[in-house]
Amino acid sequence: MTNRFTELVLDCHDPERLAAFWCAVLDFEVIDRGEGKVEIGSWQPTVEEVRARQMPPTIVFIRVPEGKTVKNRLHLDVSPIDASTEDEAARLLALGATRVDVGQGPGRSWVVMADPEGNEFDVVRSLAPSAQRLPADCS
């Protein structure tokens, strides 16, 4: 028997606010709403597609009464595709993220941030084409 990773579920106080933040971060869309719940994704899942192949999971934000009290045991890493890591961190700050010190130390190639409800995530290496890269045959 095989399973598929279909959803990542985040408990939160304000599903609408976090869904809007993460839609802006990941260029996702809201694909479902319900009482105290918002689901976002890069695609509209169907049973047939999920059965046929592994598809990217959606993210579901569910309203809970309690707040976050400790560092996450699981976090997301995001890789910018059209900006440097620092430029993307600046964009995310403008969207409502904050920089977080979790003991990572100075001089790291990634930036630790938190979403508007304090859930940590990392902005890691940029996947943007670099004008400074040399072709493979150059030395």
Question: Where do the model's predicted regions map?
Answer:
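Vicinal oxygen chelate
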Residues: 2-3, 5-13, 39-41, 45-50, 53, 57, 64-89, ...
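Core segments of cupin and vicinal oxygen chelate
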Residues: 9-56, 94
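Short linear motifs in intrinsically disordered
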Residues: 27-31, 81, 98-104
